[in-house]
């Protein structure tokens, strides 16, 4: 049984595919005053945690982020065991897994001209990516959050990490309300996806076309539509019913995504409105992320 308390040391384990943004994530945690260590072998995690807890004079770092690399790892499935040991010792452990589509990874390697870590095995780049997906499958299964960075630039990824994972949060469920454009794909990390394309589109109003769903003109237009009001009422009823079921301690993060054609008006409006509703209902850890806007 875990002995984690709200004031417990925090350990973020950063894992995932090479080229998916792990280095950006670790640098972001470092910028947020986390003590960071990269490429730590899994079998050293227990000693790492013990050294963290052994220093009782207050000088030991309370927030750490550790990068786990696929190279040289004998058995990545051990992560669950080491994670439980850390939790039993009173450390608040979170596992993040970063990934991207094959097409995105191939383009990133072409742009940077860097070699894939598994290329030393004589594999082509597509083969190395496929092999790494197989090797890291145990890490992905263990993750509290899977973050697909295919559509994110460095600045967007940094902002997302800061918003979701580095702020001091009360214990409980972290809620992210996200907007997206269907033409760029559904967010892979979404737990719930709602289609806003059935609603009236402000794009066809010349006075609203250049605005986003965060601006008063678009909000007023959508809130005046009976279909939007009915859609909102049904969404609120659904989320009010089922989000508490996910906040019983079995989940750490939930992403609720809203999609429309361009990710600019309807989906943004819904994400902002439902985030506001969640705060009004007493949820403390609520954030928004507009994939096509931020």
Curated annotation (Swiss-Prot):
Record-listed ATP binding positions: 16-23
Gene3D superfamilies: P-loop containing nucleotide triphosphate hydrolases
Superkingdom assignment: Bacteria
GO molecular function, a single term: ATP binding
Keywords tagged on the record: ATP-binding, GTP-binding, Nucleotide-binding
Binding positions (GTP): 69-72
Record Pfam families: PapZ_C, RapZ-like_N
Role description: Displays ATPase and GTPase activities.
Protein family per UniProt: Belongs to the RapZ-like family.
Official protein name in the record: Nucleotide-binding protein Smlt1108
């Amino acid at each position: 049984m875990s002995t984690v308390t709200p004031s417990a040391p925090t350990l973020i384990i950063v894992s995932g595919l090479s080229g998916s943004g792990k280095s950006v994530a670790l640098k972001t945690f470092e910028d947020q005053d986390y003590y960071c260590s990269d490429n730590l072998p899994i079998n050293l995690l227990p000693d790492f945690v013990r050294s963290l807890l052994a220093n009782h004079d207050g000088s030991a770092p309370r927030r750490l982020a550790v990068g786990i690399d696929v190279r040289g790892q004998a058995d990545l499935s051990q992560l669950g065991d080491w994670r439980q040991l850390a939790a039993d010792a009173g450390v608040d452990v979170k596992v993040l897994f970063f990934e991207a589509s094959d097409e995105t990874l191939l383009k990133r390697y072409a742009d940077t001209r860097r070699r894939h870590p598994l290329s030393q095995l004589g594999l082509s780049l597509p083969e190395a990516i496929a092999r790494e997906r197989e090797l890291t499958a145990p890490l992905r299964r263990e993750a509290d959050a899977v973050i697909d960075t295919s559509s994110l630039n460095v600045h967007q990824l940094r902002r997302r990490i800061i918003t979701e994972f580095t702020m001091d949060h009360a214990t409980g469920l972290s809620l992210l309300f996200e907007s997206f454009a269907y033409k760029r794909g559904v967010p892979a990390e979404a737990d719930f996806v709602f289609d806003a394309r059935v609603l009236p589109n402000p794009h066809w109003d010349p006075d609203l076309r250049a605005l986003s769903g965060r601006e008063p003109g678009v909000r007023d237009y959508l809130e005046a539509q009976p279909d939007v009001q009915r859609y909102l009422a049904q969404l609120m009823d659904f989320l009010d019913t089922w989000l508490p079921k996910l906040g019983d301690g079995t989940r750490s993060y939930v992403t609720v995504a809203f999609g429309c054609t361009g990710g600019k008006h309807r989906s943004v409006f819904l994400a902002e409105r439902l985030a506001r509703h969640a705060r009004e209902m007493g949820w403390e850890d609520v954030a928004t992320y507009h994939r096509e806007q931020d």
